[in-house]
Amino acid sequence: MAATAHWRQLTCSGDVPTGRIGHTLVTNTAEDTVYLYGGVNDSNEQNSQYLQDFFAFSFADKSWRQIEMSGEVQMPRAFHTAVFYNDQLHIFGGCNGRGRFNKLFSIDPTGRCSMFSPPPNAKVPLTRYCHSATLFEGKMYVFAGKCGGRNSNKRLKDMMAFDFATKTWIEVEQVGADVPARSAHAAFTCGRRMVMFGGRSSEGECCEDIYHFSYDTCMWQKIETNHGPLFGRARHSVVVHNGRVVIFGGWNGKKKLNDLIFYNMDSETSEVVHDPDETCPSRRECHVAVTCQNTMVVFGGRFRGNFMNDTCELDLGTKSLKDYCRDWLLQHAVLVGDSERTSLPRRIVDYMDKWRALVAPELQHRIPAPPSDSSPLMWIRSRMPSAR
């Protein structure tokens, strides 16, 4: 039986942002607000309108609110990246009609901007756009992207990490599989690894490969899969929710898409998901999606010259027992002990053993000082909704 999903096309109130592409969305820690920054509306290619506006979307009442920016306000830009850390958005890179950027700055929820100024002669990333940025243990990892002009095929495959504690950039020495240069790909953190796939190659073709990158060993591993045609796209949106990757839309080198794909990390299986109510958003590329309270929120994108400003939601479901077990395993990075094995269903133990592959080998036998919630059952019970 084919998987189904139900989309909601929202009628939002307030200061709804104008249609755009190349913007960023991030969710705050409380998961009650989604922030939008920047982008471009270039329906008139002779006069592209690059944006530097800042909006907050209230998940509860489905309203948008524009926030006036202050402080060290930066130039308009699109195809930058953003992560949310320490109650701030951290924006890196991007481009506009005048050039490309490699500066890092932050925006707090009130709209105040602060610029990061590296020391003289410090190593910093190259200018870029259509790159990716992931967050792991207080560091932002920037990978690949495009560094040439609008019609250039020059793409990167380097990686730099920004340490928020020391406020320094670190060049990451990548080992393992040789990942081809690309832009407009997708990358996200899952466990102690980055998962990266898709994008556009230096030859201008859509990449069908998928890779894992270990944050602990800096090693890339190519994942052999028969799902290449599904992953072969660029300018798409991706979120990860409870071990399941949710892919929506994009461009496959021939046409714009509005398909929805679920890829299960544990079983390495994928399925195309259908909406029986036929409320799926229209075909689009260069849109953005985030998760908020077990829901995927999608905004914007482009199709046939139309720059959209619709807001759509897709329910992703609440956590299962298996999901809580995975969270415990990835947080503690230890083996499931004999006593825990006897207190959990066999299928759950097998599932957790499989997810140990997301923990670096040198950490698999690390036993932390026993916290009060070191037992998986205690930890899970304290976090399930019925326990609160």
How does the language model describe each region?
Residues 44-51, 97-101, 150-156, 202-207, ...:
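Short, solvent-exposed loop/turn segments at conserved positions within beta-propeller repeat blades
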